């Protein structure tokens, strides 16, 4: 099956026409007109590749291709990413939770990844280094956070407001308007009197994508060099060494009631 490339193929071009008026000795500008168009980023702009540029890159191309084409494992099924729950976001959230357990030296309660950070699908068949880079192109790194029960409840509400994200260890029921109806950790109701551990990425730990509750973590451990892409690649290699194919499915972790 052909790998699906979901990167944007369009570039927006906006032209601003300004008028200038003089006020005292200073020029003032006002926007008079805005025009926009979309330019397709395709072979039209590279119909005749620059021969000198190609010659410059050629000595490096074979080396890069050999690294990026290396097979790390095999996907048993195709896995996509979408809300409220998807196979690929489940898998990556599981990887984060497992990695957090390695940092803590004990099981972590929750894994969390933003669907928007997963940039491509994982299709059935061989998994190459290039595939993993296409899925996780950003330099996001592991952060292990400790949250109080009340803050974890708020985090679940943050996730509901987004229409769902990739979670591990959580079971959420939300509605189409983004309201949290029910939240459980490990099959149990959240206890506001205890603390919980969350394995996520630094981007979310900083409160981005609406995850404000994560900024109130009482403890925060972010191991240097523990990129999400590297953790995922390590996971694929471990599973392959154990003779297992990579597989994940929708399990009812985030259920949207209509």
Model-flagged regions — what are they?
Residues 27-42, 91-93, 97-99, 105-111, ...:
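Feature captures C-terminal
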Residues 45-71:
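Post-signal-peptide N-terminal segment of Sec-exported extracytoplasmic proteins
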Residues 81, 85, 89-93:
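An accessory alpha-helical subdomain
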Residues 21-24:
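C-terminal motif of bacterial Sec signal peptides marking the signal peptidase cleavage site
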Residues 66-83, 211-217:
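Acidic/histidine-rich, surface-exposed loop or edge segments in extracytoplasmic proteins
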